[in-house]
Amino acid sequence: MARWATMSTETTGTGARDEGPRPGDPADSPFVRACRRKPGPHTPVWFMRQAGRSLPEYRKIRASVAMLESCRRPELITEITLQPVRRHGVDAAILFSDIVVPVAAAGVALDIVPGTGPVVNDPVTTAADVDRIRPISREDVPYVDEAVRMLVGELGATPLIGFAGAPFTLASYLIEGGPSRNHTKTKALMYGDPDLWHALASRLAEVTLAFLKVQIDAGVSAVQLFDSWAGALSEADYRRYVQPHSQAVLAGLADAGVPRIHFGVGTGELLAAMGEAGADVVGVDWRTPLDVATRRVGSERAVQGNLDPCLLFAPWPVIEAEVRRVLAQGRAAPGHIFNLGHGVLPETDPDVLTRVVALIHELTARPNARS
């Protein structure tokens, strides 16, 4: 596969795409075509957390570099992002970063602790804490801008996905001080001081939007908004406290010319509301069949998902049967991007992922489907 032809500088850093895609343009790739509900030569596949601890080459690079530091070094971001594309032949790369990178750039003191995740030094409890979260621009995250431009040149026709954390999930980290099982402090603030909650979520929406615009201006072909913890909410609470802020982010990208993917874990009952927030593609975890998800999000949106990450530890005949099932259910959607229902687990055998990619490409080959 010719994945490494360098693109001309005329195709990088253009922001909104006004011209139609040309042959070899990532905008005409199977991934972007599926996002736009257009036919393509096969069902595209990539994996959340495909650049990560399942790869020995990733573990080697990260052995002596802290997580947050690795997210601030363009040469490391570039190499780590490329690793799964080289190894697996996936249809899209996703920028290596972490959802707390933009809030750190906005002045929040935090670290990413091995085995724990993001830990915030001074959790948000007051309006003064919210006021200390400053706006960001390209100058605050130059390493992201540089890495995206490098990657677009390296990837050629393979699209690069940019990403950011959604306001609710970021707010939960900032309020709880780190990962939380029940999000008790987050919900207490949300219910008890809704004005403060909306002020925080609105500020984080501004930071997230700015972070995604940096990536789009540098040349990413799509973006994904991760709302990892949204499944902790009822639909009523989601619509009241969360949807307006995710909608602000996605609406701010409406004229950017790239597909917008919206994903959360445990959000089967929220899929319609997440789609209504402004997504072109709604990510689905493994709990909800894709044909059911398609009915919930409607015919105006593609779906992404949704193999259970744990199934990759099963015998190959079981994996193959489940891949076939997901593909069959995905045919109910106007566009389907194959993915896992959450991130690749660290213990996953990378050879199994490579085999899954090859199987999907073989089973869905449609050489004359492009139109």
Swiss-Prot record:
Its recorded reaction(s) are: uroporphyrinogen III + 4 H(+) = coproporphyrinogen III + 4 CO2
Transition state stabilizer (site feature) positions:
D98
- Tell me, what is an example of a GO biological process annotation in this record? protoporphyrinogen IX biosynthetic process
Q: Record-annotated residues binding substrate?
A: R49, Q50, A51, G52, R53, D98, Y173, S228, H342
Q: What is its EC number?
A: 4.1.1.37
One annotated GO molecular function: uroporphyrinogen decarboxylase activity
Q: Please give the chief subcellular localization of this protein.
A: cytoplasm
A GO CC annotation recorded here is: cytosol
Q: Which domain of life is it from?
A: Bacteria
Q: Where is this region: Disordered?
A: 1-30
List, as start-end ranges, the regions of compositional bias called Polar residues.
Answer: 1-14
Q: In which pathway does it act?
A: Porphyrin-containing compound metabolism; protoporphyrin-IX biosynthesis; coproporphyrinogen-III from 5-aminolevulinate: step 4/4
**Keyword field contains Magnesium:** no
Alphabetic keyword roster: Cytoplasm, Decarboxylase, Lyase, Porphyrin biosynthesis
Q: List the disulfide bonds.
A: none
Q: Which InterPro entries does this entry report, sorted A to Z?
A: UROD/MetE-like_sf (IPR038071), Uroporphyrinogen_deCO2ase_HemE (IPR006361), Uroporphyrinogen_deCOase (IPR000257)
Please state where this protein is localized: Cytoplasm
Q: Which PANTHER family match?
A: METHYLTETRAHYDROFOLATE:HOMOCYSTEINE METHYLTRANSFERASE RELATED, UROPORPHYRINOGEN DECARBOXYLASE
Q: Which family does it belong to?
A: Belongs to the uroporphyrinogen decarboxylase family.
* Subunit-structure text: Homodimer.
Function, as annotated: Catalyzes the decarboxylation of four acetate groups of uroporphyrinogen-III to yield coproporphyrinogen-III.
In Swiss-Prot or TrEMBL terms, this protein is called Uroporphyrinogen decarboxylase
List the taxonomic lineage.
Bacteria, Bacillati, Actinomycetota, Actinomycetes, Micromonosporales
